[in-house]
Every structure is written in structure tokens, then in C-alpha cells.
Amino acid sequence: MMLIKIAWRNVWRSKLRSAVVILAIASGLVGGLFSSAWMNGMANQRVRDTFSIETAHIQFHNPEFADNFDVKKTILATKEKLEELLKTQGVKAVTSRLKTPAMAATATKNMGVTIVGVHPEKEMEVFGLYKKIDTASGEFFNNKKKNSIVISKALAKELKVKLKSKIVLTFQDYNGEITGAAFKVIGIYKTTNSVWDKMHVFVKDKDLRNVLELPMDQSHEIDILLHDYNQAAIISNQLQQKYPDIISEDWSKIQPYINFITKYMDIMMGVFMLIILGALGFGIVNTMLMVILERTRELGMLMAIGMTKRRVFVMIMFETVFLALVGALFGELISMLLINYYGKVGIDLSSMAEGLEAIGYRAITFPELDSIRYVQITIMVFVTGIIASIYPAIKALKLDPANAIRTI
């Protein structure tokens, strides 16, 4: 206990030098933690948007459907499967979809798209696309009008259409014949992924089924939303065994990039912080070497009157750790305030919106960091302080008391 008190007082003997070191540590941690929170917020947003808009957590397909979107390769007995899936533990909601490639045409332009036929009520339980349509941009199949279509803002701009405009969709039906129909635009959505937006249009299941001449109780896709997306792989494997005639894929297989984000973001953040702490560690070592040089005579006197080398080593280690922890405390406090503030108001990157949306990220990002990260950083700083104290302490132990006392 006495060594701890002495070490704490020694830290503040040179207030300016200690303050500079503490400020350097705090600045490094603020930069590292805020950058980590920013990256983490962007990654989590991308993951949430993917589940909510694009993939759900698990998808069923006919094994041959994914090869070329052949409309004949369907999932049979869809209604029965949906009812059974809802009873499966861990499943929150399910819906079925029709999918077919098509050509969307207006008077000005043609574009290739994927038509998605949906059951509006079930679709809204699994996906959040309806939330991406603001009040001025129409609705998501709230009316019972026939041949309605919801398209993206990006596609509407390309095709030069607006609400109540008509789009002609041409595609191959169940019998292999080229067919098509005109659909009226009732809603225009905008997600954070402009590339995905341009490729997908949404119509009612019954409208598309009629034109496709697809038999009832058959679908191209079943989407499953879980209570916990971390259980997707386990539940998907169980469902694959239960339904061997279909392919059950969890989100990590459907979107490998999202799987990479969730798996390696923690590792990337850890490496990032290690680099910062490594640089700060060298700064601490340099400072403590200066301290040893300035206190050569004092250390020599302490050893001359009987302080053991072990106690000298521990005292210097405590001084180094105190410097590191005080810097960490200030750094984490400032980081917490910044992250909480920008986590509410967001960081506006509107100047780069087009580029960010092309890869599926929002123009306004919200930093977020789990509380456990602060505990982990504190431990890492503590360990850094101990490691940084070793070399200066060894230098102090090599001092000869008789020569050290005579040092001016």
C-alpha cells in the first residue's frame, strides 16, 4: 500500500510531463474508440438493412431455381410449409414470394429487373421495405387495385416515371411463353442500397401469379425471420433435414459479405486498437526512461538505504500503470460522450451519399459501441502499462547505488 501511495505522488511530481502523457493517451483512445464506434455503427446498419430489406434470416428455394430463375422450379405445398414453419421454435414470421426476371419498359427506356410477387400483410411482418416509402411517395399495397407496382426511386429516375405512371413488364410465363402486363406505380421506395433498388420491383402475388399462369400453392421463395439471427445457421440446418426437397440457406450463405462483417469486425477493431496502444506504449516507455534519468540520484539513495530491487521495480510499474489508466479514464469518458452524442444526431456524409449508397451504406451514420468494449480497452491499457514499465524498471535496477548517489 505504501508503494502505491509513493507511486501515485511520484506521478504528479512533474505535473506538466504527466499531463502531456495523459493527454496523448486520452487523444489516442478517443481517436481509436470513436473510429471503432463509427465502423461498428456502419457495419451494424448494413447488417440490419440487409435483414430488413433484402434477405431476412433464412431463405428456401427449389434446388434448381437459383441457377437461372426458372419459373417452373418452385417450392411445392407452400401453404403447408408456412404453417409448419410458424410453429418452429425460434421463428418469428414467414412469408412466400414469387420471383422472375423481366424487362421493365416505359415510353423512354427499358431496363432489366427482378419482379417480386408478395403477400402484402405477410411481407410487412418479415421485411421493412414498406417503411422506406414516405407519405409523399405513395403506399405499399394498401389498396385492392389490380396490377399495382412499387418501384424504387432510382429506377423511377431511370425510367422517368412517377406515381400513377404505367410500366409494362415483359417476362416468360410458366409455359415458356413470352407474356407481360401493364402495372400502375402506387409507391416509390428508397433504401440505402441504390444498386439493389434499381433491380427490384414489387407487385402483388396474385397479380403476378395470374400473368405467370403459375399453379396455386407454389412459390419460388420462402423467407423466414427469426427472433435471434445468431441462431440462423442452426435452425437452417434443422429445416434442411426436415425439408430435403428444398435448399435452406441462412443469411451467412446468402450474403457472404455480411457474414464477413459480423465475423471479422471485432478482430479488425481489436487490431486497430492494438496498433494505437502499441504506439502509445512506446511514448510511455520514452517518458519513463526520462523519469529514471532525472531521478537517478533519488533511486540510488532509496536502494542505498535498503529498498529492494523488487520494490523499486514494483514502484516504477505502478507509476507507469497509473499514468496509463488515468489517460484511459479521460479518453474513455470523452469517447463515451462523443459516441453517445453522435449516436443520436448521426454523422452526415451527404457529400458522399451516392458512393456510399452504391455499396449499401447510409449517408448518415450513427456510431455505436457496446459497453463491454470500454472494459476490454481498460484491460488492454492496463496490460500496455505493465509491459511499458518493464524496460524502464530494468534500467533502474541496473543503477549502482554508490555511483547514482554522486549523480548531479
What are these regions (language model features)?
Residues 3-12:
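A short amphipathic helical element positioned immediately N-terminal to and/or at the very start
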Residues 30-58, 339-346:
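Alpha-helical transmembrane segments
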Residues 314, 329-376, 390:
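Short helix-loop junctions at transmembrane helix boundaries
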Residues 63, 73-202, 206-216:
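A structural signal for hydrophobic secondary-structure junctions
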Residues 15-42, 263-298, 321-330, 379-387:
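Hydrophobic alpha-helical transmembrane segments of multi-pass inner-membrane transport and secretion
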Residues 367-408:
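C-terminal membrane-exit region of the final transmembrane helix in multipass inner-membrane proteins
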Residues 172-269:
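Mechanotransmission and gating elements of multispan inner-membrane complexes involved in transport
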Residues 289, 297-343, 376, 384:
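Transmembrane alpha-helical interface segments in multi-pass membrane proteins
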